């Protein structure tokens, strides 16, 4: 019976993913090749260039850009480092530490509990979205910034916007499975910039509501095509580009880059802003044990990190934090070559694992993230720096 239950869960998870592209689509990559018959190997033909930034002199945090690589541990970054020829934008961040990710009731956490600790500074149970262990809603740093500081706020992801990690910053709930309920909470969440996938839970609902129309009635500019992101005007933005998750990187293009830059443009103001950016699908492809797809998602996320760092350097008052909610796949780097930009790996699980994950920081207060912290402490440090 247990085996049947696990199989049903696995099939449900696969159906939630975007459709896997055809092999020919994958071969059109401008920077990489990928062997579909060998999911444990990957080679980059043309690496991307990384940025160089200096630590700003400002000491006060006006803006926070909190970046989460879902399922992205030191293992994934190590593989990406080798595959891109020994270069990553995230390594330009001057401060590094570690975060332990366990939930209150399980050693190996999930995205709801892992994300909730980062978002709120409160450690919680497996499966809970921005609730404390007793089931009470806990205010996230994004929500606190809006309420107390008058900051503008935003989330941009490549998964469903009502999936666990973005939900942890914007809404509350006892289960990630209630995606219609989580989506409905966004109508009154007053988040200024929302970008991702998941239209199925917004306008094809069992209760007949059309949340997209409700958001438009509240003054949101709605965008459903990636090419229209840069053209959007107004003070509030809702972008939903797919029925479920967005497609894998080589098929969707630089959506995360475009949406992140648009978010910064729209949110930047005298009172500051809080923006959460998630590289959502590193986790998905580690669950599937496909290192090539994983690297494509990691590189997409890292290129966004580079542009964020360039903007933060000019601004001088922006704290940038890059971390993960948990590690996925039990990934090991077995062989490879930095010079040849190729890797051979092994996954030990299709699930999460309990390893510490890295924390990188740049900007005012970055030094506070050095060392080893509980994941809830990461959220607490962010709140403390925002409070000064």
Model regions: which residues?
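N-terminal catalytic scaffold of extracellular/periplasmic and nuclease hydrolases
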Residues: 19-198, 203-204, 211-222, 226-229, ...
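A Trp-anchored, charged/polar loop motif used as the substrate-binding/catalytic surface
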Residues: 221-223, 252-267
């Amino acid at each position: 019976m247990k085996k049947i239950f696990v199989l049903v869960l696995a099939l449900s998870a696969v159906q939630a993913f975007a459709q896997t592209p055809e092999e020919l689509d994958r071969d059109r990559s401008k920077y990489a090749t990928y062997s579909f018959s060998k999911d444990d190997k990957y080679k980059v033909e043309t690496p991307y260039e990384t940025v160089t930034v200096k630590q700003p002199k400002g000491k006060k945090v006006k803006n926070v850009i909190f970046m989460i690589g879902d399922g992205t541990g030191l293992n994934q970054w190590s593989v990406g480092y080798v595959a891109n020829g020994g270069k990553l934008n995230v390594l330009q961040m001057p401060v590094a530490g570690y975060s332990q990710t366990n939930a209150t009731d399980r050693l190996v956490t999930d995205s709801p509990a892992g994300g909730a600790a980062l978002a709120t500074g409160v450690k919680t149970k497996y499966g809970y979205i921005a609730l404390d262990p007793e089931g009470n809603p806990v205010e996230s740093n994004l929500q606190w910034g809006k309420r107390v500081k008058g900051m503008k706020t935003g989330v941009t992801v490549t998964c469903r916007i009502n999936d666990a990690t973005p939900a942890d910053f914007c809404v509350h709930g006892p289960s990630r499975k209630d995606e219609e309920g989580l989506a409905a909470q966004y109508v009154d969440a007053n988040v200024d910039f929302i970008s991702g996938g998941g239209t199925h839970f917004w306008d094809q609902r069992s209760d007949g509501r059309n949340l997209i129309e409700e958001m438009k009635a509240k003054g949101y500019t709605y965008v459903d095509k990636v090419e229209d992101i840069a053209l959007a005007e107004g003070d509030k933005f809702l972008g939903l580009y797919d029925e479920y998750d967005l497609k894998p990187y080589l098929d969707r293009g630089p959506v995360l880059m475009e949406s992140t830059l648009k978010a910064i443009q729209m949110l930047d103001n005298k009172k500051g802003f809080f923006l959460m950016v998630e590289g959502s699908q590193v986790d998905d492809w580690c669950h599937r044990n496909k290192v090539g797809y994983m690297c494509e998602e990691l590189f997409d996320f890292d290129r966004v990190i580079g542009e964020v760092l360039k903007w933060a350097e000019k601004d001088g008052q922006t704290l940038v934090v890059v971390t993960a909610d948990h590690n996925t796949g039990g990934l090991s780097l077995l062989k490879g070559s930095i010079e040849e930009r190729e890797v051979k790996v092994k996954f030990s699980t299709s699930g999460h694992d309990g390893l510490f994950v890295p924390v990188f920081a740049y900007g005012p207060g970055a030094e506070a993230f050095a060392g080893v912290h509980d994941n809830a402490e990461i959220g607490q440090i962010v709140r403390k720096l925002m409070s000064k």
